[in-house]
Amino acid sequence: MQPVESSAIEAAGYDPAEQILALRFTGGATYLYYEVPPEVFDDLLAAESTGRFVNGIVKPRFRAVAL
């Protein structure tokens, strides 16, 4: 995982072989999002607002499991 600039998300990681996005939130919770294409991870890292991107693109489109 790598740190991201966000008030809600501490870090993001991506496994391209499995297409799994991992997000660690500031409260300590970590979620895995499945079947995430690599370009979505690239867009997340480039987003002006990481939190808005996650809420608007990632959460509505991809299945998540809390760790």
Curated annotation (Swiss-Prot):
Pfam families: KTSC (PF13619)
Domain of life: Bacteria
Protein name listed in UniProt: Protein Tpau_2998
Source organism of this protein record: Tsukamurella paurometabola (strain ATCC 8368 / DSM 20162 / CCUG 35730 / CIP 100753 / JCM 10117 / KCTC 9821 / NBRC 16120 / NCIMB 702349 / NCTC 13040)
Lineage, broadest ranks: Bacteria, Bacillati, Actinomycetota, Actinomycetes, Mycobacteriales
